[in-house]
């Protein structure tokens, strides 16, 4: 490897909005990183899936385009 061409690879403390803190290594250049979602609070990893209610959007679509018939 060539000398002095690679970025600095240092430890970074990652803080999630849920309060979970962990340390990793990165070329970020800052000692702290704040994220909104991590493995401790993401629904995929916790098994607590959230169902998004889109009934209002579907009803608006049906009201707007419900009377349209296919041509042909």
From Swiss-Prot:
GO cellular component terms, A-Z = ribonucleoprotein complex; ribosome
The protein's matches in InterPro entries, at most eight in alphabetical order, are given as:
Ribosomal_bL28/bL31-like_sf, Ribosomal_bL31, Ribosomal_bL31_A, Ribosomal_bL31_sf
Q: Which GO terms describe its biological process?
A: translation
Q: Which cofactor does it need?
A: Zn(2+)
Q: Which Gene3D superfamilies match?
A: Ribosomal protein L31
Q: For this UniProt record, give its keywords in alphabetical order, as a comma-separated list.
A: Metal-binding, Ribonucleoprotein, Ribosomal protein, RNA-binding, rRNA-binding, Zinc
The record describes how the cofactor is bound as: Binds 1 zinc ion per subunit.
Q: Does the keyword Ribonucleoprotein apply?
A: yes
What the entry lists under Pfam families is as follows: Ribosomal_L31
Q: In which residues is Zn(2+) bound? A: 16, 18, 38, 41
- Does the entry feature the keyword RNA-binding, yes or no? yes
Q: What's a Gene Ontology MF term here?
A: rRNA binding
Which SUPFAM superfamilies does this UniProt record tie to the protein?
L28p-like (SSF143800)
Which intervals of the chain form a coiled coil?
none
Q: How does it assemble?
A: Part of the 50S ribosomal subunit.
Tell me which family the UniProt entry assigns to this protein.
Answer: Belongs to the bacterial ribosomal protein bL31 family. Type A subfamily.
Do you know which NCBIfam families this protein is assigned to? L31 (TIGR00105), PRK00019.1 (NF000612), PRK00528.1 (NF001809)
What this protein is reported to do is described as: Binds the 23S rRNA.
* Protein's name according to its UniProt entry: Large ribosomal subunit protein bL31
The gene behind this protein is rpmE
